[in-house]
């Protein structure tokens, strides 16, 4: 008998099994706009455009980085899919867009249907939180490129916004106010530094951390800010939005600012999430490096006119009680200044 694809490490039967398992999971994210099910060559989506004068599609793509390694070590795979959606959708939200649909890509050394189902279940949960549809994806089994139990994730989000409502930060001026939306923890960036800090302090993922374990605390999925931004857009003019990912406030806030405008942040050290204080202690990491790597408890920064601050906080705090004014826009060549109190 001749060589088969299965002999070379690719099991098509497991691929078929995975498709059957995930079909119902994916279907739960579909509304009437989705015209196709799983298994076709492409996903079809018919957006509702009647309320838009000049609709513009907004796209974003990202991954989860080395947080996946943590999921592998804990053998817990049902939350990194939420991270994947969050990393893409939160970027799309920064332009004022409403998320429409999402696609995922999973690459692995050996297809494990139950594990893949957990991953897709997380993606579907992220899509539900984002109010967007999971309309397609790809699972690639690549023995020789990945170890048997290794995998990687990539995602692609598409949203829509009316052209005259695109948020690009160009109208931000001196005196405007920055509002912070709280993060759920480390989110999906800086995990290479986290792992190095754990190794330096000989801290194990199974060690106790407050009311949970170190591993479980670090694995908490990235917050998705669709509800906050959607609610605010209905009532207030948002001038700029920054998703605080790798590089922290220092690298992400400038991406929404016009020239010669910066934000001076006032942050209380007592309000910084304990997980960041622990990482800093484990790795003896300098404070500037912490703020240059992690979100430090701020997952998104929204800029509004000073007259809209109270109304904005009233809206946002119904969803995120920790939302607060965190800074003021000033004329300066320094994009970000952090006052730690």
Swiss-Prot record:
GO terms for molecular function: ATP binding; phosphoribosylamine-glycine ligase activity; phosphoribosylformylglycinamidine cyclo-ligase activity. Keywords: ATP-binding, Cytoplasm, Ligase, Nucleotide-binding, Purine biosynthesis. GO terms for cellular component: cytosol. It is an enzyme of class 6 (ligase). Pathway: Purine metabolism; IMP biosynthesis via de novo pathway; 5-amino-1-(5-phospho-D-ribosyl)imidazole from N(2)-formyl-N(1)-(5-phospho-D-ribosyl)glycinamide: step 2/2. It holds the Pfam family AIRS_C. It comes from the Bacteria. NCBIfam families: purM (TIGR00878). This is Phosphoribosylformylglycinamidine cyclo-ligase. The gene is purM.
């Amino acid at each position: 008998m001749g060589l088969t694809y299965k002999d070379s490490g690719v099991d098509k039967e497991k691929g078929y099994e995975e498709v059957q398992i995930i079909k119902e999971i994916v279907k739960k994210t579909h509304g009437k706009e989705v015209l196709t099910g799983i298994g076709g060559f492409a996903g079809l989506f018919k957006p509702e455009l009647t309320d838009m004068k000049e609709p513009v599609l907004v796209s974003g793509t990202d991954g989860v980085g080395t947080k996946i390694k943590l999921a592998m070590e804990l053998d817990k795979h049902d939350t990194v899919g939420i991270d994947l959606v969050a990393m893409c959708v939160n970027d799309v939200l920064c332009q004022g867009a409403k998320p429409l649909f999402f696609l995922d890509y999973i690459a692995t050394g050996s297809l494990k249907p139950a594990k893949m189902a957990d991953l897709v279940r997380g993606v579907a949960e992220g899509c539900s939180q984002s109010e967007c549809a999971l309309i397609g994806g790809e699972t690639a089994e690549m023995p020789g490129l990945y170890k048997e139990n290794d995998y990687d994730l990539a995602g692609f989000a598409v949203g829509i916004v009316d052209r005259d409502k695109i948020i690009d930060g160009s109208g931000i001026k001196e005196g405007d106010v920055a509002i912070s939306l709280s993060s759920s923890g480390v989110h999906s960036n800086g995990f290479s530094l986290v792992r190095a800090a754990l190794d330096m302090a000989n801290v194990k993922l199974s060690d106790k951390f407050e009311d949970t374990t170190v591993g479980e605390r670090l694995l908490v999925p990235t917050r998705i800010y669709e509800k906050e931004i959607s609610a605010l857009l209905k009532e207030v003019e948002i001038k700029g939005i920054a998703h605080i990912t790798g590089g922290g406030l220092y690298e992400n806030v400038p991406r929404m600012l016009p020239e010669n405008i910066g934000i001076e942040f006032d942050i209380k050290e007592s309000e910084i999430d304990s997980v960041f204080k622990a990482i800093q202690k484990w790795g003896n990491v300098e404070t500037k490096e912490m703020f240059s790597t992690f979100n430090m408890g701020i997952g998104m920064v929204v800029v509004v006119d000073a007259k809209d601050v109270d109304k904005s906080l009233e809206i946002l705090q119904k969803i995120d009680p920790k939302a607060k004014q965190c800074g003021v826009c000033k004329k300066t060549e320094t994009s970000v200044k952090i006052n730690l109190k």
